[in-house]
Amino acid sequence: QLEDRGMSLNGVVLLSSIMNYGVRQPGYPQNFVTLLPTYSATAWYHRKLAHPAATVGEQVQRARDFALGPYASALAKGHMISDAERAEIVRQMSELTGLSPTFIDNANMRVELSSFRKELLRDRRQTIGRLDTRYLGLDDDASGDSPEDDPSSSAVTGAYFGVFRDYVANELNYKTDVEYRM
């Protein structure tokens, strides 16, 4: 049907699955609320919690309840939050994420994913993966703000690339002599 309308397919463009870049804008707390359970599961997996739940599912539920309740409410208050409430939110976040209260407070209770990936295992001089937080990496600069690389991406890129090339060639019947680089 595209050719009937004067358009020919001349390649494949893969885009990120993110549907709303607006959630990443300053002042919009939803991204932090939805990431907190993942942070908690990651801290549970890497044994960084002082009082972990018995299972990762229970840990995630604890974090989800906190994130959707007290944490979301605290972020919505912005600078109007009381010092006492802020201190309590920071304390609970620390218990759920394994991050220090000072780090969380300095981040204004809004811990970016790259910062979390660098900070959680900083004491071991390790970083965690972005796509799969079970993967570990080592940075040359342990004092940096964010990881130098994504160990989870490095681990799966070869397999992903092979499957992608097979899919494009055999399912989409796209043939080319041009080298595809990732």
What is each PLM-predicted segment?
Residues 2-101:
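A catalytic-pocket lid/entrance helix-loop region that shapes and gates access to the active site
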Residues 78-182:
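Alpha/beta-hydrolase fold catalytic core
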